[in-house]
Every structure is written in structure tokens, then in C-alpha cells.
């Protein structure tokens, strides 16, 4: 229920999403529900961040597609990043990130609608939004590259 302040203005509280993981002595990772993932030493935190960025981008797209009755029927893709010392503060961080996704949508929206849906997917992926260096995206939709 929204709270009403003394000045009569209604303050809405943003929805909160909470996540937790556990790290086992063997390096395995588990979610709060107990689902486990055994990761080899070649999986660095940076790789996991990129995997999260790709999954988040697709989940965001799927959300916006669902609102207009369109299905994401298949998807493949990847991401890359450059980590180095930032000029602004001298700390090592992601200074460049790019995402490339190829998706199949049914039914296929009009070109203007596709551009809007892709923009919303990029904007609303909280992993990408959390990065100081905003990711660049390259989308292929139903076999055609979509420049943004």
C-alpha cells in the first residue's frame, strides 16, 4: 500500500528483487533455491558478469515482447568486455562491453516496433544499467541485422 506523506503526496515504493548465491568449498555456486552449478577455474568473475549481461538482456527483451504478444522463439549470442585501469579513478573496471544477440521473434513486429523493443530491452537490463561503461549492442532479428 502506498504511503501518504504529510503534504498529501503519495510515495510509491519501487519493487525490490533480491538475489543470493552461495559459494562451496569446491568452487560450486548455488542459488537461494539450492540449484547448483559447478564452475571450472576457467570461469572467472568477468565471464560470469558477461553471461549475466547476455541472460539479462534476453530476459528484458522477453519481458517487453510478452507485453505486446510477441514470442522469443530462439536466441543465441555472446558478449565481450575490456577490463583495464580507468582513467577517471585509476581502478580496474569494465571500460568497454559489447553484446551480440541473434533472436527469432514470432510474429515479426514492424521495423519501428522492433527498434523500440530492442531499445527497451537494452535500457531495462539491470546488469547493463549497473555498468559505468554502458554496453554496445548488435542485434540480428529474424536473420536481419538491426542497426541502433
Feature annotation, model-predicted:
Residues 1-52, 58-148:
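Extended beta-strand/beta-hairpin segments
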Amino acid at each position: 500500500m502506498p504511503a501518504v506523506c504529510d503534504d498529501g503526496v503519495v510515495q510509491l515504493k519501487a519493487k525490490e528483487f533480491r538475489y543470493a548465491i552461495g559459494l562451496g568449498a569446491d568452487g560450486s555456486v548455488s542459488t537461494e533455491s539450492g540449484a547448483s552449478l559447478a564452475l571450472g577455474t576457467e570461469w572467472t568473475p568477468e565471464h560470469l558478469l558477461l553471461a549475466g549481461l547476455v541472460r539479462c538482456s534476453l530476459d528484458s527483451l522477453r519481458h517487453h515482447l510478452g507485453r505486446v504478444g510477441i514470442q522469443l522463439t530462439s536466441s543465441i549470442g555472446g558478449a565481450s568486455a575490456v577490463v583495464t585501469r580507468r582513467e577517471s579513478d585509476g581502478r580496474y573496471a569494465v571500460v568497454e562491453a559489447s553484446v551480440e544477440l541473434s533472436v527469432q521473434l514470432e510474429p515479426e513486429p514492424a521495423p519501428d516496433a522492433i527498434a523500440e523493443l530492442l531499445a527497451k530491452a537494452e535500457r531495462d537490463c539491470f546488469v547493463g544499467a549497473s555498468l559505468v561503461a554502458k554496453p554496445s549492442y548488435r542485434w540480428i532479428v529474424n536473420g536481419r541485422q538491426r542497426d541502433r
